[in-house]
């Protein structure tokens, strides 16, 4: 994505999408409802505790970036909604996948299908893969596939609203097997060097003996 959101903007945008799909009768959201959604303990990773003023700052930034706006619907209490349908032409399956990625971070296809059921029913994994493919094929792409983690059978996917995701240290750490092989290789190299040094020392001793013998012939 060309625009990079901070962590709070990501959380607010994810909550607006989620609540539109799960509780449309209460959408658009008041500031209080949106703050509660941001601090919700279920379906969130990480779990946050934020004040309304932080949510307001995030909303103002999202409005400036044309990703959210103040709803024009009647009522004395201001309410807010996202603009991804108008701005990016996203459909409910795409919104559901993006909401999950925004609210929980990188996930596998299976995790997205299971967790996204509350927002949109996916008949099978292929349906989720199709949605991910469409989101990755956009210009600019909205989603990326991450390198497969050590010990995992499946790759995870991440949103790009906050730029390219940083790979966790765990993803870059060699597996125990790889680490063990590295140590074994180092040990073999050291043993070989020690053997070569011992051989050189023997040769030096032999050369000294020969030199001494040669000298003794002239004494």
Swiss-Prot record:
Q: One Pfam annotation, family name?
A: DUF480
- InterPro entries, sorted: DUF480, WH-like_DNA-bd_sf, WH_DNA-bd_sf
Organism superkingdom = Bacteria
Signal peptide (UniProt feature, chain positions): none
Q: Which family does it belong to?
A: Belongs to the UPF0502 family.
What is the protein name given in its UniProt record? UPF0502 protein Gura_0277
């Amino acid at each position: 994505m060309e625009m990079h959101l901070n962590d709070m903007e990501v959380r607010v945008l994810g909550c607006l999408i989620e609540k539109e799909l799960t509780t449309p009768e209460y959408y658009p959201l008041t500031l209080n409802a949106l703050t509660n959604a941001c601090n919700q303990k279920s379906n969130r990773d990480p779990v946050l505790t934020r004040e309304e003023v932080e949510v307001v700052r995030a909303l103002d930034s999202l409005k400036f970036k044309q990703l959210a706006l103040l709803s024009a619907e009647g009522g004395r209490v201001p309410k807010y909604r996202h603009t991804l349908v108008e701005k990016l032409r996203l459909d409910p399956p795409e919104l559901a996948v993006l909401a999950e990625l925004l609210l929980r971070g990188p996930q596998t296809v299976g995790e997205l299908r299971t967790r996204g059921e509350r927002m949109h029913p996916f008949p099978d994994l292929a349906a989720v893969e199709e949605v991910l493919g469409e989101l990755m094929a956009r210009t600019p792409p909205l989603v990326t596939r991450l390198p497969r983690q050590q010990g995992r059978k499946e790759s995870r996917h991440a949103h790009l609203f906050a730029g390219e995701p940083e790979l966790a240290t765990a993803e870059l750490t060699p597996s125990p097997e790889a680490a063990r092989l590295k140590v074994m290789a180092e040990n073999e190299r050291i043993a070989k060097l020690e053997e070569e040094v011992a051989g050189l020392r023997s040769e030096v001793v032999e050369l000294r003996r020969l030199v001494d013998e040669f000298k003794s012939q002239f004494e």
